[in-house]
Amino acid sequence: MSAHCQVTGRQPSFGKSVSHSHRRTSRRWNPNVQRRKFFVPSMGRTITLTVSTKGLKVIDRDGIEAVVAQIRARGEKI
């Protein structure tokens, strides 16, 4: 499972870890993504989305129907 939110588009960010002696090594920060199932009444079925915690708040605010319409408008298959 890739660390990519289907709602917000959030992806891993990259940077450096800095030790006490100031050695810099590459690292990445993964978003908190979860696989969640949502029932979509207009489709009459359950869909599984990979969403970040911010994406869950967006679904709570806008509703699953609006979010599914946005995802389909981007051309993603659900």
UniProtKB/Swiss-Prot annotation:
One Gene Ontology molecular-function label: structural constituent of ribosome
Superkingdom of this protein's organism: Bacteria
Q: One GO biological process from the UniProt record?
A: translation
Q: Which UniProt keyword terms apply here?
A: Ribonucleoprotein, Ribosomal protein
What do the Gene Ontology cellular component annotations say? ribonucleoprotein complex; ribosome
Which residue intervals make up region (Disordered)? 1-29
Q: What family is this?
A: Belongs to the bacterial ribosomal protein bL28 family.
Protein name as it appears in the record: Large ribosomal subunit protein bL28
Q: What is the lineage of its organism?
A: Bacteria, Bacillati, Actinomycetota, Actinomycetes, Mycobacteriales
